[in-house]
Amino acid sequence: TSADANTVVTEDMTLYAQWSDPAVDLDVTVSYSNVNEAGEVTWTNQDVTVTLTANEPVQSIEGWTLDETQTVLTKAHDKNGTYHVTVRSADGQEKEVEYTVSGIDKKAPNIKIGGTGNGENYREIKSIAIHDPEGISYLMINETKTEINDKYKYFTDIKALGVVEGTNTAVVVDNAGNETKITFGYDKTAPTFKWIVDNNTQAQSKEVRLETSEEIQLPDEGWSLK
């Protein structure tokens, strides 16, 4: 029968709600292989590995290594500097990332001996100077180690550094672990000598020998070493 104006019709209805994850903005964090737990950059003479970690899967980037989760990118850098890279998520979002690599030092420190002598052999040493623009850790001469922790040092007290008469070995090491090693001789004692002639008369001798207590340089071309 037809319902009149006062009739109320009811009907059961079932409603279904469909939920979807809200859109997530791409976020990328940067970390470095030469930054310690305190957040401090440490010197290194090796390449620095930069790691980009995303909060969702990203696309591969030329020159970078993408891990199995597709959320971590890594790349080794051999020079300090500020770099830029564009990271793209799997769903097409883009994020420009700027990062700075620092703490790389692959150059060995310098050491210079100031003195008088012949080549690497000195009869007088007035000074020993060491230098590295990124900082020197220590200087070791023979068995004596001197802490530096500075970019430049000039020493005049060579005995305190460990220099002895004879053969010396000096090693200077910078903060990144690069080292320079040199060997030098130090002899401040003058040689003794005596003349030896073949007939005990120097004026009539055909051969004159000069015997010394240590090796010397030849006076001129007329002499020979035996």
Please report, for each region that a protein language model flagged, where it lies by residue:
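Low-complexity, disordered linker/stalk regions enriched in Pro/Thr/Ser/Gly
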Residues: D21-K226
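Conserved "repeat-terminator" motif of extracellular CCP/Sushi domains
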Residues: A3-A23, T86
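General secondary-structure propensity
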Residues: T1-A3, V97
